[in-house]
């Protein structure tokens, strides 16, 4: 077995100046089969990409927050069918837009309260500024993230929902709301709860919402492509050195390949990693089980046919039909689960092969409702976007899967 060929697509985009660098891992049956360290974590400084590089993992944060919430479910402090107003009374009088892209003052009442399960499956009717269009998009972009969770939630509660709770999937701030609820249940800062309930037990010592002064040198620089397809690094500032005023439960974590591998191994291992139990088998089963109806799957997701051969558990995509999923999303047996991050971070766990793949980069993309079409129309972006699927397909082929 030779896995070296899975690097080719990544090295190609790095050599073409479309990507700064990447760290990838292939793990199977309790063995780390491969680690690729490609390119640079800081091009200008000439610092090579290394295994211990810290990445902004964006929405790969979401399953970690969900795991913290499910640990509360395990203890009977929270239930999936609980109305969120029990801990978030700000959202007790939600209205629904008559037209999702229409005026904010044209609404009708919500048929029911938002449930915890609605948050975990993004069926609450909440949104992101980039997942919707019109006045509601602009309103989401003005939310005050820098003033703490209570101020942020109060502002969010003034916005109408884009659809009825439970009707369909709209990618949203739902997990940020979940983070506020988890913090209120435990009466503690979110970073402390996630550390005590997930990161600590799982042995994820390099993961958090802030990066110590000593570890700052390991943080990967964020890049974007300008109009001439040249890499620019003036995208984001350095990591927080102390806990931020509002820990972004839906996208604020930094992590390393080794750390996140431990988290995914925990999910693949029914809640345990290296003999330490983090979650109950039932909570992990719930996270990894498709919960969407056929009607919900008829709708596109961020402009793409995301649900072909796939479903959605508790913030995890789940392969339900490998034959239908494979042509669009690459190889992965029944029950394969995953959730990516906006900056190109990606992972997949395939129970049928006892296999985990990790692919970590730092690239700031175009985030819009038609982002999928924008990528398809730009050869450079399409080339960059296909580097990861080629890595996956070549890995599966080399493993004889």
Swiss-Prot record:
<dbReference type="InterPro" id="IPR001466">
    <property type="entry name" value="Beta-lactam-related"/>
</dbReference>
<dbReference type="Pfam" id="PF00144">
    <property type="entry name" value="Beta-lactamase"/>
</dbReference>
<protein>
    <recommendedName>
        <fullName>Protein Rv1367c</fullName>
    </recommendedName>
</protein>
<dbReference type="InterPro" id="IPR012338">
    <property type="entry name" value="Beta-lactam/transpept-like"/>
</dbReference>
<dbReference type="InterPro" id="IPR050789">
    <property type="entry name" value="Diverse_Enzym_Activities"/>
</dbReference>
<dbReference type="GO" id="GO:0005886">
    <property type="term" value="C:plasma membrane"/>
</dbReference>
